[in-house]
Amino acid sequence: MDPPAEKPGEAGGLQITPQLLKSRTGEFSLESILLLKLRGLGLADLGCLGECLGLEWLDLSGNALTHLGPLASLRQLAVLNVSNNRLTGLEPLATCENLQSLNAAGNLLATPGQLQCLAGLPCLEYLRLRDPLARLSNPLCANPSYWAAVRELLPGLKVIDGERVIGRGSEFYQLCRDLDSSLRPSSSPGPRATEAQPWVEPGYWESWPSRSSSILEEACRQFQDTLQECWDLDRQASDSLAQAEQVLSSAGPTSSFVF
């Protein structure tokens, strides 16, 4: 499946702003954002996203992005999903030195050479260029030998398109690929096999943020709630003191005492 065609009036698209980021995360500072999900918002411009220097997990899938320029400053980014956009290159990711997982299925990447910018990323182990379940792909995936080209270009990858290529289980996936190749339609006449349908909904196998990131996010939210309660108590105490002072001042000095 190719990326969605541009709709009338969508050329400008939406731009990421500080207000948008703060409203979706509840954070006071952009540098404090660790996890960000901006899926399917019609975004065409990443705007100030490059200021989120602490960002570790980012989902930009299902938008209208044509470039990733601001992501070049995100050195802590570990998981990135830019599937189903209009990207023709990934060059800004060359400086994302902590990137471990990249989903770029459903874009306009035409040749394996456009992945050369990823060759210097020491932590990159998971790469997806094609997602049969979501019916997303890239033009380069039309070449049956693209797998071999990607493996040669990025030898550190452990998983390509959801299939393990290094380590335990890689032999099983290789066997499946060999069987798949042998079952591809030939030029000989005969009934055409029924196309396999997805077993699960798109996004079922999507990776989610690590437990540590989720715990940290929850802790931050609890801290914000506690801080808000402190502000409320301080305001109530100030109101009580003001009322007490008003009562004392209106009573005046006491002239006599009764025992």
Curated annotation (Swiss-Prot):
Matching SUPFAM superfamilies: L domain-like
Keywords, in A-Z order: Leucine-rich repeat, Repeat
GO BP, sorted A to Z: outer dynein arm assembly
Superkingdom, natural source: Eukaryota
Domain LRRCT: 138-178
Keyword Cell membrane: no
Chain positions of LRR repeats: 32-53, 54-75, 76-97, 98-119
PROSITE patterns xrefs: LRR
Pfam family, one: LRR_8
Gene Ontology molecular function, alphabetical: alpha-tubulin binding; dynein heavy chain binding
Gene Ontology cellular component list: cytoplasm
PANTHER family from the UniProt entry: LEUCINE RICH REPEAT PROTEIN, LEUCINE-RICH REPEAT-CONTAINING PROTEIN 61
This protein's name: Leucine-rich repeat-containing protein 61
Species this chain originates from: Homo sapiens
Source organism phylogeny: Eukaryota, Metazoa, Chordata, Craniata, Vertebrata
